[in-house]
Curated annotation (Swiss-Prot):
It comes from Yersinia pestis. It catalyses: (S)-dihydroorotate + a quinone = orotate + a quinol. Pathway: Pyrimidine metabolism; UMP biosynthesis via de novo pathway; orotate from (S)-dihydroorotate (quinone route): step 1/1. This is Dihydroorotate dehydrogenase (quinone). The gene is pyrD. It is found in: Cell membrane. Catalyzes the conversion of dihydroorotate to orotate with quinone as electron acceptor. Keywords: Cell membrane, Flavoprotein, FMN, Membrane, Oxidoreductase, Pyrimidine biosynthesis. The keyword Flavoprotein applies. It is a peripheral membrane protein. Its cofactor is FMN. The keyword Flavoprotein applies. One of its GO terms (molecular function) is dihydroorotate dehydrogenase (quinone) activity.
Length: 336
């Protein structure tokens, strides 16, 4: 497989520069006859989830294609679903660089990107141009300069705009890189947000005559009590799914490694066990009342099976995709 050679070259570069270079090349082939250069044949293994039919259970997690620039090229690699974003109502540059770090020895990444994106309107134009045959999820967040108390308005603005174009909508309230965002996961703030989102979903369902499911993405850094409360809120508000988990602030598994002290969210293999534990506990609490999309450190067939055994109906990859390449998609779908 060619990817080890590509990876070796890319890993000589700054991580964000490598990402930009890769996406520049993918944009050139996306939606063109040159897509065959990245296409691979992946078995069809249909999964029904959130009322949708997925051609296979392996998806791309949000954060890689924030602006939906390479949907078709990524789709050609065999993903059953792709989640673009996180996107915000207005464009924003994100946090200062450098803001992305490879923990190569641990096959992890630390990012403090800060929802850098070109805004929801730009994303929609890119989605309109795409021809991806799988399910497209759109992940939404709030702008950094929107006060947390008014944060729900940003989610509602985004929902209003993306609803006709989304297969499902992911509500990101768990990024550690937007100040105050994670506070929306708790108590009255969560109930208030979920009630508003559910009302908006009902309104948009009637307006567009189609039902677009909503999933909420949660953090791994939750106590058992917090997890139980979140599960209860999701069920009470009839949310359609939960994505577990986002990146972690915990550094216990990468102590002493290069960049371990960098601020931001840690993903990849060091997150694997904790995210699986959260999925397992969530599954016990939810008792099948809403499905779980499992994400966090999936870099092998074994890791994917562990997520599904813990209770995930679908899985997503990101860091594992960076470290292992497109072959990981085919490998998991074939052997899961």
């Amino acid at each position: 497989m060619y990817y080890p050679l590509v990876r070796k070259a890319l890993f000589q570069l700054d991580p964000e520069r490598a990402h930009e270079l890769t996406f520049r090349q993918l944009k050139r082939v996306s939606g063109t006859p040159l897509e065959f250069l990245v296409r691979q044949s992946v078995p069809t293994k249909p999964v029904s989830c959130m009322g949708l039919s997925f051609k296979n259970p392996v998806g791309l997690a949000a954060g890689l294609d924030k602006d939906g620039e390479c949907i078709d090229a990524l789709g050609a690699m065999g993903f059953g679903f792709i989640e673009v974003g996180t996107v915000t109502p207005r464009p924003q540059v994100g946090n200062d660089k450098p803001r992305l770090f490879r923990i190569v020895e641990a096959e992890g990444l630390i990012n403090r990107m800060g929802f850098n994106n070109h805004g929801v309107d730009n994303l929609i134009e890119n989605v309109k141009k795409s021809h991806f045959g799988g399910i497209l999820g759109i992940n939404i967040g709030k702008n950094k300069d929107t006060p947390v108390e008014q944060g729900k308005e940003d989610y509602l603005i985004c929902m209003d705009k993306i609803y006709p174009y989304a297969g499902y909508i992911a509500i990101n309230i768990s990024s550690p890189n937007t100040p105050g965002l994670r506070s929306l996961q708790y108590g009255e703030a969560l109930d208030d947000l979920l009630a508003a989102i559910k009302d908006k979903q009902t309104e948009l369902h009637q307006r567009h005559h189609k039902y677009v499911p909503v999933a909420v993405k949660i953090a791994p850094d939750l106590t058992e009590e917090e997890l139980i409360q979140i599960a209860d809120s999701l069920v009470r508000h009839n949310i359609d799914g939960v994505i577990a988990t986002n990146t972690t602030l915990d550094r216990s598994l990468i102590q002493g490694l290069n960049y371990c002290e960098q601020a931001g969210g840690l993903s990849g293999r060091p997150l694997q066990l904790r995210s699986t534990e959260v999925i397992h506990r969530l599954s016990q609490e939810l008792k099948g009342r809403l499905p779980i999309i499992g994400v966090g450190g999936i870099d092998s067939v074994t890791a994917a099976r562990e997520k599904m055994a813990a209770g995930a109906s679908l899985i997503q990859i990101y860091s594992g995709f960076i470290f292992r390449g497109p072959g990981l998609i085919k490998n998991i779908v074939t052997h899961i």
